[in-house]
């Protein structure tokens, strides 16, 4: 399978928090959310939250997977 040129885009939404800083989430993945004192910190925290959610779902899928299923890890480059 040729993944060259494949791009997956997610829309990050950063909202000012009443107490200061920002809350943030991905529109396409509402279960991925975070916060930060600055936009840069919020973005870094949101990407960390995405990694944690992906790791969680990967482990859960492996626990309940179908015997004999073929798994292939696909690497997607961020731009």
Regions flagged by a language model, labelled:
Residues 14-27:
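Short aromatic-glycine-(Arg/Gly/Cys) micro-motifs in beta-strand/loop hairpins
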Residues 20, 31, 54-55:
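Intrinsically disordered, low-complexity segments enriched in small/polar residues
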Residues 1-10, 40, 44-79:
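Short, charged, surface-exposed hinge/linker loops at domain edges
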Residues 9, 25, 34:
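Conserved beta-strand segments that form the floor/walls of ligand-binding pockets within enzyme
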Residues 30-39:
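A short, exposed loop/beta-hairpin motif centered on an aromatic-Gly-Thr core
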